[in-house]
Every structure is written in C-alpha cells, then in structure tokens.
C-alpha cells in the first residue's frame, strides 16, 4: 500500500490487535434514555438534509427518545468547535458530536481524555470488516478507536458552469495549473464577473481550504505530507512557489477580499456569474438542495494539478466522556456506522460512504465518480478539515490566511512564517 493511502479494502488483520482485549467501555445496553442531543455544524442546505435523513431513521428506531439537534452554523465548524470546547470544559458535553477523522479526533479530543473508547462497539458491529483498515487508524490512539466515520468527502474538486465555460471558449477541464490560469484569462476576457470564485467569510476557513489544495497541486503529495512530518520546510522554496500560485489565483477573484461564506460565494457557479470554484464536494449537495442540476448548472473535475490525487476528509461521530444519555448515543453511533444509515445520509450530504459495501445505485454521477477515484487515486489528507492537523493548527492556519488576505495578499514570506510557527507550536 502506498504511503498516505487509505484503500477501500477490509483488512481485519490490521485491526486485530486493537480488538483483542479491547475495553468494555462501549458495551451496549438497551436504549432507555428519553433524550439524545447531537452536536454538529450541519445547519442548512445539503448538510442539513443529509443529517435529517439520518435523524428520521433514528427517530423511527428510537420512538421514545426525544431528539435534540444542537447544530451550530458555520462552515468547517469554525463556530461550533468554540462552543463545543466551552461546553465540554463546563461539564456539559453533548451526547455525541461531529469531529473529523485524523488529528482532529486523535489529538484534539482523544489524547485529551475527552472521548470514550469505542473499540468494543467496532467489534460488536463488525466495523473492523466494513470500514477501510487505514481509515480506522485515523480514529485510533494507542490501540483504542475513538469515533465512527460516517462518510468520505473530497476536498480538491474544481467546479464550473458548462454554459459559462462554453461562452468563454473553454471546452474541457484544465488538468494543470498552467491550463487553469489560461482558462481564467479566457473567463476574464469573456466578461465573467468573477473568474475565480472566492469565499472569504466564516473565519477564513474556505480560503485556507483553497491554500491547502494549492499546496498539494503545486508541491505534489510527498512534499505536502512532508510539511507535517518535518521533511519539507514551511519556509522553504516549495512553499514559496506554492504561495505565488495562491497569490495569482486570488488576483482573479475579488482581490482576495470576498467576505461571502462558501454557500453564497459558490452560488456564482450555478448562476453563471463565476468561472472556477475550488471547494469540497458538499457544494454539489448544496446546489442540488437549491434546485440546481448536475451536468447542466454545474459540473466537476479534479482540481488542476491534482488529477489522480484524492484530498480527503471524513466526518465522524464520537461518544464524549460524561455523556448524559449514553445508551441513546450508542444507538446513534450504531446507526451512523450502519449501511442503512450511511446510504441514507451520504447521497443527500454530497459524500460517499465510509463503508466498503455501500449501494452505489443510490448515488448520483458525481458520487459514483468520487467512489471510483477513492478506490484508485493517491490519497492525501486535508489540513483544513482535520486529517493532517488538529484544531489548534487549523485555527492558526485560518488566522494566518485571514491576516494575509486583509493585508492585500502580498506578504508571502509572512504567511509562510506564520504557518511555520503554527506547526512548531503544535509539535511542542
């Protein structure tokens, strides 16, 4: 298996040590709880629709349990995570909360003793056979598993409007960064209002998301992963070159000062006023929820420079230490990890299932394409969505990007130094 990859295979032997002698902390009991509170940042659009499908199943299976949806709006959880931290510090943890697989789960929560060990639940539900072995590793610390993946998202997606592209003389998706810049010039000459759609609101996470993609596209996956292993320097020539690409991309937007959230900004694609948009595949679910049609109002391709690369993230659910309605939470986790639950949730959420046995006939053409790429592409974790970075680094990255944009997107060296300082602080 190639470095950094997570394949759609079930390798039970890889997880065997974690299962052997596992904790009994997640031993199931009948759900006699009268309430259940879930905490996410899925408050609108396709995200809320996906959550709603899962909630409907839960209510049908647990009719005596009142469902409490404690969603906090804000893309990538920029608002929700702050609220969650305050609640957990005050001893008021929700019964289950959303967290990204990778360092977000492992370093931000599990290593802090905030989550229950779910290894026994994995054994009882057979998830060691139905989830990819390497994905399970992304929720595992010291042999114990701490969250349940409900999906896989792709971060490095290029979106555009076919009719707008045709008017600009663009007949195929750009595959390289140079080709993308050539097409941006075509959009500009054709009078497209915003050749490069930018989303600068919601705590700058969407601009950090764009930077994360640019780093992979410019440097390649090995150099990118080296930023977190220490083999690539944040202040070295590779990052310097990537930041020139980033700076140039921003020049095709609203001078890097767009204050729209990702949903409002992305509407420029389906309305035909925007050229290209780099955003995760939750955008497709959002647009479909708004009535747009895939293939007519928008289409997709891997981000230029990342053809054959799948920059991934995974939403998972947890069992916090001290959850008031523990049995109700266990019922939610079992549903979230089930085939029925994942195939109800993901087609509406705009993601593919984390399970290996998903029924792809329920998914649209984009998601079928994503599933095929997930099975064969070089996989690279998302920084902006918690795979390669914990909450502390993500917050620092958002702040560094916000500072860069507010300064006119001119201080590339300063941005590199801020990112290096953020990584150094995490390592310490």
Predicted regions and their residues:
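Short, low-complexity disordered leader/linker segments with a strong preference
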Residues: 1-37, 60, 421-428
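Short, solvent-exposed loop/beta-turn-alpha elements that line the ligand-binding surface or hinge
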Residues: 119-131, 175, 196, 200-201, ...
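Extracytoplasmic "Venus flytrap"/periplasmic binding protein-like
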Residues: 57-131, 138, 166-169, 175, ...
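C-terminal capping/gating helix-and-loop segments adjacent to ligand/active sites or protein-protein/ligand interfaces
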Residues: 351-354, 370-424
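Extracytoplasmic/periplasmic substrate-binding proteins
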Residues: 41, 55, 244-328
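Periplasmic solute-binding protein
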Residues: 106-111, 135-172, 181, 200-226, ...
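A structural signal for short loop-to-beta-strand junctions that line the ligand-binding cleft
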Residues: 94-95, 125-163, 194-198, 299-300, ...
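Glycine-centered hinge/linker elements that transmit conformational signals in sensory
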Residues: 184, 228-258
């Amino acid at each position: 298996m190639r470095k950094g990859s997570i394949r759609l295979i079930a390798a039970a032997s890889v997880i065997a040590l974690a299962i052997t002698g596992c904790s009994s902390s997640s031993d199931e009991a009948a759900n006699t709880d009268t309430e259940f509170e879930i905490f996410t940042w899925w408050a609108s659009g396709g995200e809320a629709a996906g959550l709603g499908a899962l909630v409907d199943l839960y209510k049908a299976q647990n009719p005596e349990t009142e469902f409490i949806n404690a969603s906090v709006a804000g893309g990538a959880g920029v608002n929700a995570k702050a609220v969650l931290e305050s609640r957990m510090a005050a001893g008021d943890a929700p019964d289950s909360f959303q967290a990204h697989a990778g360092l977000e789960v492992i370093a931000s929560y599990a290593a802090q003793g905030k989550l229950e060990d779910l290894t026994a639940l994995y054994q009882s539900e057979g998830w060691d056979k139905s989830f990819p072995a390497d994905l399970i590793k992304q929720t595992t610390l010291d042999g114990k598993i701490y969250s349940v993946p409900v999906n896989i998202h792709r971060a490095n997606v290029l979106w555009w409007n076919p009719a707008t592209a045709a008017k600009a003389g663009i007949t195929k998706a750009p595959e390289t960064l140079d080709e993308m810049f050539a097409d941006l010039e075509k959009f500009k000459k054709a009078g497209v209002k915003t050749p490069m759609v930018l989303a600068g609101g919601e705590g700058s996470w969407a601009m950090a998301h764009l930077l994360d993609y640019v780093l992979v596209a410019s440097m390649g996956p090995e150099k990118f992963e080296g930023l977190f292993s220490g083999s690539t320097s944040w202040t070295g020539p590779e990052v310097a070159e990537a930041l020139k690409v980033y700076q140039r991309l921003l020049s095709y937007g609203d001078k890097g000062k767009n204050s729209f959230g990702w949903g409002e900004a992305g509407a420029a694609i389906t309305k035909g006023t925007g050229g290209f948009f780099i955003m995760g595949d939750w955008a497709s679910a959002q647009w479909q929820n708004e009535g747009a049609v895939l293939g007519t109002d928008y289409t997709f391709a891997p981000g230029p420079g990342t053809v054959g690369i799948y920059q991934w993230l995974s939403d998972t659910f947890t069992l916090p230490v001290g959850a008031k309605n523990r049995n109700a939470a266990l019922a939610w986790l079992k549903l979230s990890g089930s085939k029925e639950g994942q195939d109800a949730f993901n087609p509406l959420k705009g993601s593919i299932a984390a399970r290996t046995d998903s029924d792809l006939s329920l998914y649209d053409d984009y998601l079928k394409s994503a599933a095929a790429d997930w099975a064969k592409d070089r996989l690279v974790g998302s920084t902006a969505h918690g795979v390669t970075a914990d909450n502390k680094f993500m917050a620092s990255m958002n702040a560094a990007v916000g500072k860069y944009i507010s300064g006119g997107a001119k201080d590339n060296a300063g941005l590199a130094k801020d990112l290096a300082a953020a990584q150094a602080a995490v390592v310490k």
